[in-house]
Every structure is written in C-alpha cells, then in structure tokens.
Amino acid sequence: MAGNSQRRGAIRKSGTKKGTSVGSGGQRRRGLEGRGPTPSAHMRPNHPAAKRAKAQQRRPARGRTDETETVLGRNPVLECLRAGVPSTALYVALGVEADERLTESVSRAADSGIPILEVPRTDLDRMTANHLHQGIALQVPPYNYAHPDDLLAAALDTPPALLVALDNISDPRNLGAIVRSVAAFGGHGVLIPQRRSASVTAVAWRTSAGAAARMPVARATNLTRALKDWADRGVRVVGLDAGGDTAIDDLDGSDPIVVVVGSEGKGLSRLVRQTCDEVVSVPMAGPTESLNASVAAGVVLAEIARQRRT
C-alpha cells in the first residue's frame, strides 16, 4: 500500500542513496541549543569588524582631552581650589610636612565635598610618574576651554584688551609659562589652535603656578580665521617673531592688542604671519639668536604693561 514503509522483509539502510552523507542525528543542533542566534560581525571579538570598532572607540575625539588631569604642587593645587575648579579627588602623601598652603588645600577640599585620600608617598610618586608633587595632587576633569568670541567679548569689556595667541607652540611648559605672564601683566586670556598645539594639561597647570585657574584659555578650530575675526572687531594683531620688522621699542601698546607668539624653532606660520598688522622682535645685544617663546612673550607683555602704566 502506498505510504507503507513497513513492507514485509524490507530492510532500512543507513543511507538513502549511494554517496549521500549521513546526518548528525541532531547532535550538532542540540549542541547549539541555548546559545541564541549567531552574533553580528562587530560583536565577535576576533572578527576584523569588531577589532576596527574597538580601535575607533579607543581613538580620542579630535581636539578634545577626555582624560582626567592631575594638578601637582602646593601652589597650583591651592590656586585651583581657591578658584573653585571642579575636582574629583585630593591626594595627600602620608606623613608629609604640612604648611599653610597644604592645610588650606585640605580645608577647602573638605568644605567643597572633594574626597581627600591619604596615600603612601610611593603611591603618589607612581601616580604622578615621579613628577614633582610636593606631597599633594589634585585630580580635575578635562579643562573647560572658552570660546574665542566669549574671550574677546570679556577682554573688550575691560579695555584696553590684551590677549595672547599661540602659533606652533607644542610644549605645555611654554603654554603654562605664557599663561602665567599674561596674568602677571594684566592680560585677559590666551588663544590656542585646536590642533597641533599644547593643551592645558597638568604640566601646563604646574608651570603656570596656578594662573591657569583664573586666566581663561580659548581654543579655535582655525587660528587664522579667529585672528581675522578679532581684527574685524578692532583688535590689532601683532606677531612676535625673531625675524620681525619692528623692534618692541617702537610698538604702540595703547590699542586693543593680541600678541601672536610663534615657536622658537618654526616661528610664525605663513598664513598667521600674513594676518598680522605688524611683526615685532626683541632686540638682543649678545650672540643668542632667539629667545624661548615664553620668555619673549613675557618681554613684550612687560613692555605693553609699562606703556599702559604711563
């Protein structure tokens, strides 16, 4: 009868046809039970797509500083706390000799609800990569850069404006020293490019002796365009370069000014130099060819401050 496979004398063979493979009997399927559907490529750790996605996640966003910074030293830490810089933790070395600065830092941190952690000095050395910390370190979130328009507006509100822009300055110690000089000579702030420039890091904080806590630093996507915008609003753009055409003795510092500082090696870039109304230099009597960028900036700022006092 049709459909009746149990014919008398019939013998079921292990394969249906010659050459066909025999199935696993469901063993493989049962082995996959409970594992769910096959994950997509980017979710499988060893798949190239997953490796590319992981590398993209590790890559920092352009122009941003996403890591927590550590401010070292008693003066910088105290200046940050006095200025109310948001902080996540204060580390103090066990057994460190306290002075007024350390005592005030601990008191201010406690009043602000900042966790205070006492750690062995060796741990603090390791955490700060053996940089000079004087027994105290403050963790702060990434620096909150000002917008160039806001920086200029604040400077114009308290005339005459005095600003400094940095071109090709890659050493954070130079940035910190210039921020300190700007604060010392009555300047209003510092402008840096978003790329290929030093950032306000812990090293810059340390070199500024805490001045970075009260001196705004703005970051421009395009330095040349930002300087042109400032020039359109009445600010004189004065470049500072060893090959400048004008000595600082002949500089008129009475107008709103932004001093653009080039690096000691490269000087001012071509487009930035073309944007300047004039380029000044610091005359030197000795055989030294050029000054460190932060030293040269301090000399010019001191000259402008002298003129404005008289």
Curated annotation (Swiss-Prot):
Name of one Pfam family that matches: SpoU_methylase
Q: Which family does it belong to?
A: Belongs to the class IV-like SAM-binding methyltransferase superfamily. RNA methyltransferase TrmH family.
Q: Which organism is it from?
A: Mycobacterium ulcerans (strain Agy99)
Q: Which domain of life is it from?
A: Bacteria
A Gene Ontology biological process noted in the UniProt record is: methylation
In short, the EC number is 2.1.1.-
**Record field: compositional bias (Basic residues):** 49-62
Protein name listed in UniProt: Uncharacterized tRNA/rRNA methyltransferase MUL_4155
Gene Ontology CC: cytosol
Enumerate the residue ranges of region (Disordered).
Answer: 1-70
Molecular function as annotated in GO = RNA binding; RNA methyltransferase activity
Q: Which keywords, in A-to-Z order, does the entry hold?
A: Methyltransferase, S-adenosyl-L-methionine, Transferase
